[in-house]
């Protein structure tokens, strides 16, 4: 049975039926589809378009379908065109002809737009919750490891920072990610139900009632816009892409830091794998997979942008392709957020190695230049002097703090004994606004 067909002389071919069906993926929307239908029926009864008896029968049937799906008694599968057909045809089989009144003053165009907005809002809030949990994990990791380490530019040791300050940079990145998702939810928080196919309906329905019952702040203002655009999905996937970019950058650093070349951290066995041939290997596969899966979300974004870029108003079947892009990107970003939280919550920082890396990198060179500036030298001249000292130290395989005062005075007479205290690594992060590094 189909929800259409009166104007056709021939049946749809099996090839086309399979090609056209979206049930294999839009079945994820069953809860939203039934919820939307129930509110629609309540509104029809409120507006005297359905009788009280008719609405009660339809609501009871919809509740039984939802209950059976939730309890595993009814599988969402079969030769149905989509989730809407599945629900409506099952409803007809259960309660008879009255079920055919369910779709009064509604099109599948506004129905699917509603389902998708409800689903996107619900799942986006789940992403927000996982971001907040990851932020808590990051903050806790930083508080436990407020130790000095090298800060980098160009992947070259640059200045002293703390592990806490470094990892908290990601906390603030994820804070903005969270705010972007919440903003996207706010923008999509309008109900398309009642837009029908593209031009509303001649029935005097109550769109404000359905919007309020479904948790939206208001109905959409324009019928065509309500059923024609998926910009809210594109915005969400764009936000997910930025989250994945941040997760990927963090993953890359974890991969580097866990290598023997850095040896700053230990990733727990729970989030590592081994080699089938090399017994000694412990591979950071969790971080590598997050880095790799970033491309999947980027792909979903570009795919949906490409799908939407050339289609005229209103609904076109191309838009069926929006579901899998959101589903795939949602599944990916949620799993990656959870894996990152697990990985960071079990991470161990090697304080000895982070400190040794600081000593070997001339990371107090900028502070040494500042010392000379404080003694009256222009910064550009101080920069040149310290550069010459670094060159000298490299040749001698020594650190700035390890060369004698007599040696320093060969480069500038401004050096005094207090220079060693000034360029001490711990002291450098307790001076000026560097105190904020903690």
From Swiss-Prot:
Question: Subcellular location, in the record's words?
Answer: Cytoplasm
The chemistry this enzyme catalyses reads: 2-(N(omega)-L-arginino)succinate = fumarate + L-arginine
PROSITE patterns on file: FUMARATE_LYASES
Q: Which GO terms describe its biological process?
A: arginine biosynthetic process via ornithine; L-arginine biosynthetic process
The answer to whether the entry has keyword Cytoplasm is yes
**Xref: CDD domains:** Argininosuccinate_lyase
Keyword field contains Cytoplasm: yes
The primary location reported for this protein is cytoplasm
Q: Which UniProt keywords apply?
A: Amino-acid biosynthesis, Arginine biosynthesis, Cytoplasm, Lyase
Give the metabolic or biological pathway: Amino-acid biosynthesis; L-arginine biosynthesis; L-arginine from L-ornithine and carbamoyl phosphate: step 3/3
Please give the superkingdom of this protein's source. Bacteria
Any GO MF annotation of the entry: argininosuccinate lyase activity
**Group of enzyme by EC:** lyase
Assigned EC number: 4.3.2.1
Record's InterPro entries? Answer: Arg_succ_lyase_C (IPR029419), Argininosuccinate_lyase (IPR009049), Fumarase/histidase_N (IPR024083), Fumarate_lyase_CS (IPR020557), Fumarate_lyase_fam (IPR000362), Fumarate_lyase_N (IPR022761), L-Aspartase-like (IPR008948)
What family, per the record? Belongs to the lyase 1 family. Argininosuccinate lyase subfamily.
HAMAP family xrefs: Arg_succ_lyase
Identify this protein by name: Argininosuccinate lyase
Lineage here is:
Bacteria, Bacillati, Bacillota, Clostridia, Eubacteriales
């Amino acid at each position: 049975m189909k929800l259409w067909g009166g104007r056709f002389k021939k049946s749809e071919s099996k090839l086309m039926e399979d090609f056209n069906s979206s049930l294999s993926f839009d079945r994820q929307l069953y809860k939203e589809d039934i919820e939307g239908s129930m509110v629609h029926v309540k509104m029809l009864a409120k507006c005297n378009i359905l009788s009280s008896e008719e609405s009660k029968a339809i609501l009871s049937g919809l509740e039984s379908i939802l209950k059976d799906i939730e309890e595993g008694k009814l599988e969402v599968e079969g030769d149905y065109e989509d989730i809407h057909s599945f629900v409506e045809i099952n409803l007809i089989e259960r309660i008879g002809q009255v079920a055919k009144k369910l779709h009064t003053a509604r099109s599948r165009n506004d129905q699917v737009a509603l389902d998708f907005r409800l689903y996107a809002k619900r799942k986006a809030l789940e992403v927000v919750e996982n971001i907040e949990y990851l932020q808590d994990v990051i903050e806790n990791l930083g508080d436990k490891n407020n130790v000095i380490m090298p800060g980098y530019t160009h992947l070259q040791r640059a200045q002293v920072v703390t592990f806490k300050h470094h990892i908290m940079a990601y906390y603030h990145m994820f804070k903005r990610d969270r705010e972007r998702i919440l903003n996207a939810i706010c923008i999509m928080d309008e109900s398309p139900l009642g837009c029908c196919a593209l031009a509303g309906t001649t029935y005097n329905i109550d769109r404000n009632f359905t919007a309020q019952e479904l948790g939206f702040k208001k109905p959409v203002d324009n019928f065509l816009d309500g059923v024609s655009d998926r910009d809210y999905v594109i915005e969400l996937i764009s936000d997910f892409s930025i989250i994945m970019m941040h997760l990927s950058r963090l993953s890359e650093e974890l991969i580097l830091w866990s290598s023997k070349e850095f040896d700053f951290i230990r990733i727990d066995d729970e989030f590592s794998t081994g080699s089938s041939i090399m017994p000694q290997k412990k591979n950071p596969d969790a971080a590598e997979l997050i880095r790799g899966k970033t491309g999947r979300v980027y792909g979903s974004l570009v795919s949906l942008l490409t799908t939407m870029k050339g289609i005229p108003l209103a609904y076109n079947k191309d838009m069926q392709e929006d579901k899998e892009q959101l589903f795939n990107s949602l599944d990916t970003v949620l799993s990656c957020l959870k894996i990152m939280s697990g990985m960071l919550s079990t991470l161990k920082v090697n304080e000895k190695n982070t400190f040794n890396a600081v000593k070997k990198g001339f990371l107090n060179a900028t502070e040494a230049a500042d010392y000379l500036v404080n003694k009256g030298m222009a910064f550009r001249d101080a920069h040149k002097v310290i550069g010459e000292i670094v060159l000298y130290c490299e040749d001698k395989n020594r650190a700035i703090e390890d060369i004698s005062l007599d040696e320093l005075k060969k480069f500038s007479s401004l050096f005094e004994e207090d220079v060693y205290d000034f360029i001490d690594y711990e002291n450098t992060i307790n001076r000026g606004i560097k105190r904020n590094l903690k």
